């Protein structure tokens, strides 16, 4: 990411994107990790896990894929999207394409 892109990311832009995606993204739960060994190993007082496995695509990558798909100009949507992945990103990209009718 170049500096211009990074400078354009503001709290307001994050909140806008959250609102834009919220109707299509699952609000997944977080659970507190109760393993004393891992808490000791990581040197943390508390650790929470975000259960993104409950997301429609089974991964947090759905957020990014849908965010990008929503930014595709209308006249370019007829070309669809391509994802170079054999894993979570490809699954999320396919899901985002379906949601956005690409």
Residue locations for each model-derived region?
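PLP-dependent amino-acid enzyme catalytic core
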Residues: 1-102
């Amino acid at each position: 990411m170049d500096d211009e892109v990074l400078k354009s990311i503001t709290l307001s832009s994050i909140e806008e994107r959250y609102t834009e995606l919220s109707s299509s993204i699952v609000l997944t739960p977080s659970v507190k990790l109760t393993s004393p060994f891992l808490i000791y190993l990581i040197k943390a007082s508390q650790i929470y896990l975000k259960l993104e496995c409950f997301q429609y695509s089974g991964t947090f990558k759905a957020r990014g894929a849908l965010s990008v798909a929503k930014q595709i100009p209308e006249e370019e949507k007829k070309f669809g999207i391509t994802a170079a992945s054999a894993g979570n990103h490809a699954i999320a990209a396919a899901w985002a394409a379906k949601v956005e009718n690409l």
